[in-house]
Amino acid sequence: MKKSILLATCFLAAVTCTSLYAQASAGGGPHLASDTIPQADRMFVSQAGAANMAEVALGNLAVSQGQSDAVRNFGNRMVADHTAANVALNNLAGPLGLALAQQPTLQQEQTIDSLKNMSGASFDRHYGRVAVKDHEDAVRLFTQEASFGADPDLRTFAAHMLPTLKQHLSMAHSLPGGGL
């Protein structure tokens, strides 16, 4: 049953992101030439890509090291949703001549490394706190891009991802340690 739900969630996330990409590409208007992409859009692509990579790595840790079902299920959801988001973002960034980060930031790597050494209830509490902070940061980043991004497709992508990120944040608050 859980595998069926996970597969359905992964499929839905992939279809949604692919659909958003198709809609943005079909009606998003003219793209900016890669040499004219503002620094803010470049930073968004880089930061969003790194954040997605971090969420996938953290989600995998939650699945393997989490004690509670809530943490493990949330981890599975993070892997599915953030993998799909990175695919969609890469599909938008490529034609703009922008490359996604290939790994999490140094700070994100340090957080991942600290969680690798934890297990059980301690892992769950720490992971819950990290999930809340990371999704608060992601909501701010995507809100900024949705409101002020120069590239129309990146703006659309950010706006369409915001409800999912806000849902993740709400879910993270219900995890052990997520109430901070």
Indicate residue ranges for each PLM-predicted region.
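His/Met- and acidic-residue-enriched segments that coordinate or traffic transition-metal cofactors
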Residues: 2-11, 16-180
